[in-house]
Amino acid sequence: MSQPRPGHRPDCNGADPDSNFASMTHSARPFTEVVIEADCWQAEASAEATVLRAIETAADAVDADTGGAELAVMLTDDDHIRQLNASFRGKDKPTNVLSFPAAQPEVQPDGAPRMLGDIAIAYQTVRREADDEGKPFDHHLSHLAVHGFLHLVGYDHETEEEAEEMEDAERAILARLGIPDPYAGQDRVS
């Protein structure tokens, strides 16, 4: 039996086939790499394209210098995101999306790309939430990719004011994607 590659996660049922490294985009927008780390994402053939489109639309919509920067989006499973959530946030439970903004050096080394950070999205939680809320999976995935991206460019929702600003940005970006307001009929939660 061969050893799994470092960083490779088995599929959501415990199998260990090769993971897929999705394609990247490059333009005035950030260079985005989507890594499909858990094979349960294979059930959603359009996941990579959905994430890339959401990130590109968000980058076009926000007032942030993202051109030439890089970010990675890891499509993972509940077990791995639970571990990340426990390690980085002290919450030992799965969540839908985590963002890890990159620390910016005072001086960028010549030729080195500027890193925006990383986003992790958990398949089972996203699927469960989409089903529970009666939303198309790709709409919910787009929302979470946008949410994660906004964290990378400085948005947050720690206060009511921040939450309102972030949700307004999400609504505007999702509207550009033809996705209905994900907060319609909900009480604001920061």
UniProtKB/Swiss-Prot annotation:
The keyword rRNA processing applies. SUPFAM superfamilies: Metalloproteases ('zincins'), catalytic domain (SSF55486). Its EC number is 3.1.-.-. Its main location: cytoplasm. The keyword rRNA processing applies. It is found in: Cytoplasm. Its cofactor is Zn(2+). One of its GO terms (cellular component) is cytoplasm. Zn(2+) binds at H147, H151, H157. Binds 1 zinc ion. Residues 1-25 are annotated as: Disordered. InterPro entries: MetalPrtase_cat_dom_sf_prd (IPR023091), YbeY (IPR002036), YbeY_CS (IPR020549). Keywords: Cytoplasm, Endonuclease, Hydrolase, Metal-binding, Nuclease, Ribosome biogenesis, rRNA processing, Zinc. Belongs to the endoribonuclease YbeY family. Single strand-specific metallo-endoribonuclease involved in late-stage 70S ribosome quality control and in maturation of the 3' terminus of the 16S rRNA. This is Endoribonuclease YbeY. It comes from Rhodopseudomonas palustris (strain ATCC BAA-98 / CGA009). The lineage of its organism: Bacteria, Pseudomonadati, Pseudomonadota, Alphaproteobacteria, Hyphomicrobiales. The gene is ybeY.
